[in-house]
């Protein structure tokens, strides 16, 4: 199941699995605190299986175009999971003053 949530109004659960699907250089320039780099082209069943099946996966990108595509790709691998697309991406998070981190 894919659902959408505005990143600016979203409250991250304490142990959230947050995947930033931009390329690694864009991720290193700045990403939402707690997000891990999972470039869209690298998403596969092996990576997906590293996350507990009942754990929602929160997906974001730079501005909101790659994350929905990544969610569709993941849903194609396992439709029983919950995928949450964080709309607006890193750009909206930065503009809203949410904490960002730099580096890999």
Please annotate each region the language model reported:
Residues 1-17, 21-56, 65-104:
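Rhodanese-like catalytic fold shared by cysteine-dependent sulfurtransferases
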Residues 60-61:
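Short, surface-exposed ligand- or partner-binding patches at beta-edge/loop junctions that are enriched
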């Amino acid at each position: 199941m894919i659902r959408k949530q505005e990143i600016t109004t979203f409250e991250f659960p304490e142990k959230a699995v947050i995947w930033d699907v931009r390329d690694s250089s864009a991720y290193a320039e700045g990403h939402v605190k707690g997000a891990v780099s999972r470039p869209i082209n690298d998403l596969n069943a092996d990576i997906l299986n590293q996350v507990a099946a009942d754990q929602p996966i929160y997906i974001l990108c730079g501005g909101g175009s790659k994350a929905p595509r990544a969610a569709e790709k993941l849903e194609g691998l396992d439709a029983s999971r919950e995928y949450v697309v964080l709309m607006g991406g890193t750009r909206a998070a930065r503009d809203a003053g949410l904490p960002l981190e730099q580096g890999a």
